[in-house]
Amino acid sequence: MASLKEIDTRIKSTKKMKQITKAMNMVSSSKLRRAEKNTKQFTPYMDKMQDAITAVAGASSNTNHPMLRPRKITRSGYLVITSDKGLAGAYSANVLKKLITDIEAKHQDSSEYGIVVLGQQGVDFLKNRGYDIEYSQVDVPDQPSFKSVQALANHAIDLYSEEEIDELNIYYSHYVSVLENKPTSRQVLPLSQEDSSKGHGHLSSYEFEPDKESILSVILPQYVESLIYGTILDAKASEHATRMTAMKNATDNATELIDDLSLEYNRARQAEITQQITEIVGGSAALE
């Protein structure tokens, strides 16, 4: 049995750890509320961008912009969104596991794909396993602005525009609720022309200046940038929710451990007192 001093030391250290995890839980809760607000505020902008794409691409059935035109896939691109920090449960690990599983299933050689990474956790994971990273960005703010991730989005888009890759897939953790997030992947490029033209066929009567292709060459890259940014906002909400849950579980576990240690301390203390009383009684009997 551990000594009273050892048990007391463990109780004190666990209480300190509980204070830290409780504070981190509260901080993550605050960050989650802001992330949810950011995502909600960004949605109307994405809706308007969708309308703009629909108005132009949907006005003609023969739009031939490279971002809307599928081509033979000889090299795939993967944009993976992870966290910079740990203490977020399996947030990054689940996304990276899904990425690696898909890469191993689809490709025989590293020349068949390129990886762009957001987040230190993803960079470390992939480098430690020998994967080449074409571009990475770390130290992303907890509430990222569009400008803070624009370089990453532009690089991923340039890989497709310059035909270094023939498709761009994004891997991230989709925020469902505080208690649920889902490792998700979806194709970003080429854009689905069917999706970009659905629901607004009556806009074909519009006239465009200078012409549809010139307009698309401007708004399509902006639209893809917005898709990537919106996905990052979604992933950040998932990260904060996962970390908040992890810190709550850690706090609850610390509380349970403190209770168990306190019970062990009281039992050890009682045994020590009983032994002292027994020794005193035994000593008194010996003197009689």
From Swiss-Prot:
It comes from the Bacteria. GO terms for molecular function: ATP binding; proton-transporting ATP synthase activity, rotational mechanism. The keyword Repeat does not apply. It is a peripheral membrane protein. It is found in: Cell membrane. One of its GO terms (biological process) is proton motive force-driven plasma membrane ATP synthesis. Its main location: membrane. Keywords: ATP synthesis, Cell membrane, CF(1), Hydrogen ion transport, Ion transport, Membrane, Transport. One of its GO terms (cellular component) is proton-transporting ATP synthase complex. Gene3D superfamilies: 3.40.1380.10, ATP synthase, gamma subunit, helix hairpin domain. InterPro entries: ATP_synth_F1_ATPase_gsu, ATP_synth_F1_gsu. Produces ATP from ADP in the presence of a proton gradient across the membrane. The gamma chain is believed to be important in regulating ATPase activity and the flow of protons through the CF(0) complex. NCBIfam families: ATPsyn_F1gamma. HAMAP family: ATP_synth_gamma_bact. Belongs to the ATPase gamma chain family. F-type ATPases have 2 components, CF(1) - the catalytic core - and CF(0) - the membrane proton channel. CF(1) has five subunits: alpha(3), beta(3), gamma(1), delta(1), epsilon(1). CF(0) has three main subunits: a, b and c. This is ATP synthase gamma chain. It comes from Staphylococcus aureus (strain bovine RF122 / ET3-1).
